[in-house]
């Protein structure tokens, strides 16, 4: 398939002001805190410092529709609803922009949009209780796509940060060294691992990975930990049998 780039009109969000909100939050309050701090804090701030304007329109079949309508002359009307856009257009015939929002734009609103925020109300019981939340656990590959954008959007729209701590996990890779996915068919069923090697062996294998590091799946290592666990089990049984306890 030939991929041919073309010029087209898109919707952008100017990021200068949003970026500054996140950078000032980190500089003045040290938030959010990254675990592990190295290298993720530096990666996060460096990306913000070099941030470009964000293209938020996508030519996809699914997603949140862009709330913009056009009349026959090409004038644009941005509104919460089609009826409101029609009022702004003084009853002119309108058609909605066919594009949808970038999924990360929608996801950036998650911290507060799920807590009763409707675009105006910024004080609900859920918002007071859960924003900011204690911690977000996420992969290092979406620090830019999700974490930074949640910080910027939450700070901009409701005036506080979305979470205090970000716990960064590694990515689980298949035996081929690529991220596990259904499309690659390189995933493993953890239940099968439990049945084959035991829960303890699988847990030891996962616990042996350095914090925040990627995991390249290796059945041989799990088998090694199973053999080790068997030795501990047999040694414990021997001690208990000879101590008169069961």
Name each model feature, range by range.
Residues 59-63, 67-214:
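Alpha-helical recognition segments enriched in aromatics with Gly/Pro capping
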Residues 4, 113, 241:
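Short catalytic/ligand-binding loop motif for oxyanion handling, primarily in non-cytosolic enzymes
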Residues 59, 240-244:
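Long, hydrophobic, amphipathic alpha-helical segments used as structural scaffolds
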Residues 1-72, 107, 142, 146, ...:
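Residue patterns forming the tRNA-binding/recognition surfaces of aminoacyl-tRNA synthetases
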Residues 223, 243-246:
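Conserved nucleotide- and phosphate/pyrophosphate-binding catalytic cores
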């Amino acid at each position: 398939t030939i991929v041919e780039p073309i010029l087209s009109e898109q919707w952008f969000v100017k990021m200068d002001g949003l970026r500054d909100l996140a950078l000032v939050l980190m500089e003045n309050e040290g938030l959010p805190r990254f675990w592990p701090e190295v290298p993720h804090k530096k990666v996060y701030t460096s990306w913000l410092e070099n941030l470009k304007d964000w293209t938020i329109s996508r030519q996809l079949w699914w997603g949140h529709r862009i709330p913009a309508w056009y009349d026959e002359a090409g004038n644009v009307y941005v509104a919460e609803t089609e009826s409101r856009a029609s009022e702004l257009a003084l009853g002119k015939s309108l058609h909605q922009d066919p594009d949808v929002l970038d999924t990360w734009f929608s996801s950036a609103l998650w911290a507060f949009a799920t807590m009763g925020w409707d675009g105006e109300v910024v004080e609900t019981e859920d918002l007071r209780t859960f924003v900011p939340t204690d911690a977000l656990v996420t992969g290092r590959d979406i620090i830019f796509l999700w974490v930074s954008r949640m910080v910027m959007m939450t700070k901009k729209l409701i005036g506080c940060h979305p979470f205090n701590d970000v716990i960064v996990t590694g990515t689980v890779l298949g035996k081929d060294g690529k991220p596990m996915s259904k499309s690659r068919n390189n995933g493993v069923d953890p239940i099968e691992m439990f049945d084959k090697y035991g829960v303890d062996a699988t847990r030891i294998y996962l616990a042996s990975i350095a914090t925040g590091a990627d995991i390249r799946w290796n059945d041989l290592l799990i088998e090694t930990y199973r053999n080790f666990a068997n030795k501990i089990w047999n040694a414990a049984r021997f001690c208990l049998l000879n101590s008169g306890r069961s």
